[in-house]
Amino acid sequence: MTTPRRTTPREWMNRLEATLEAFDETGGHRVLSQVFDELGVEDALSHVVLPYLHEVGERWSTGSIGVAQEHVASNVLRSRLSVLMGAGERPEGPLAVLACMPGEHHEFGLMATSIVLSRLGWRTCYLGANTPTAELAMTCRTLRPAAVVVAAHRATAFAANAPALRRVAKSTTIHLAAPGATADVAELCHASRLDGDPVRGARTLHEDLGVPRSLIDESTAV
């Protein structure tokens, strides 16, 4: 018997485009359910969801789609990712605080990092887009997290807030994420970098901080 051909990431992305950019939210949710069922959460995020969202932004910036289409696609994806956030958290797991820098509204990559960390047994406090550094610092003083992940698409956003990030780094480990996380700005902020794909970045953080083996073993069975 011939093994059925698997749908490629490109084909999944085309299906999302055909539904969401035609304002078919129900169809878009159906495609997303199929994507996650076939690929699993992490591969779906890395190979379909995040690349598709990047393409949506590119098409909006070139005028290929309108604001309404971009909003529908973004809102459907945000609602689906929000459902996944927190799944798998363990009461004894380490805590991560996640936030975008002031002025940064691109949060989907950070949401993906939060999802993967929670699936690895972490507890997460997700502050989201455009978080003032004073609020980030207050949250860290209150919760005393094992790690802080901050995201920005421009290195200047990190550099402008470097003094505040250095103060936070005195009591916890800070990890810079997204394209703005250059080596130079990480050094300036007394932080490390989560280089590359948000899913891989979450796994790197998980492994580098020496999470107890029991959590790693149980999380991989999810």
Predicted feature descriptions by range:
Residues 179-222:
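Peripheral docking tails and interdomain loops at the edges
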Residues 79-173:
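Conserved mid-sequence domains
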Residues 1-88:
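Long amphipathic alpha-helical segments
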Residues 97, 175, 192-194:
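Hydrophobic/aromatic beta-strand patches that form the interior of the parallel beta-sheet core
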Residues 172-180:
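Short beta-strand elements of ligand-binding domains
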Residues 31, 139-142, 204, 208:
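CheY-like receiver
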